[in-house]
Amino acid sequence: SRSKVKKLILSNNLKINQVIVNDPSYVLKLGDNIEFCIQPEKIQSLKPYEYKLDIVFEDDDIIVINKSSGISMHPGAGNYDNTIVNALINYNKNSLSNIGDELRPGIVHRIDKNTSGLIVVAKNNQAHEHLSKQFNKHSITRIYQLLIWGKIRPSKGKIETLITRSSKNRQMMEVSRTKGKKAITNYETLQIFENDKTPTLSLLNCKLETGRTHQIRVHMNYLGNSIVGDDKYKKKFKKIK
């Protein structure tokens, strides 16, 4: 990121034409020779987390877990200890795939922290590769149930857009007309709740054809029907008493 590069420059880690330069505003000239000294980041060791996993299926290759809302999938900024991965280390640290990120052993796919539902964990690299191929080919069906503000018309349909990182908040995603990755969400209204005392709510099933970051949340927000309880992509509605 820009801030990391600036910090490297201010810490005398940049040489231009073999001379240390610690001025981030230095303007490069044609022919300048640039050297960066970048120290490898220290990998956080994964600590076991005593957390009761709701295991619905397990064999020699996979573990299927019913993830609760409120727990992150894997370690990240601000939380390196209390995640599903840490709980898996505590449960079965010697039998998890090690393909990819060292902080995500066994993790083939993810769901958001405040989302509950089934996740599949790979216990070995062969299972990880097979599962990854299935997710990439979209041969695994993923259906999510959610409660949204308002009601969608038509009550059943497909949302197909490009999704990219928000230009205003790098921790959020947004729909774009010109850039990003294709995102496809099929939705169906199951039930509508409406009365004179509270805002209208709708219960939906959403089936994903792609798996972009925050895809359903972004698509619902794009339609103007954000998910109830979603503080990041919420619309302003009066509180339900």
Per-region residue spans from a language model:
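RNA pseudouridine synthases
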Residues: S1-K241
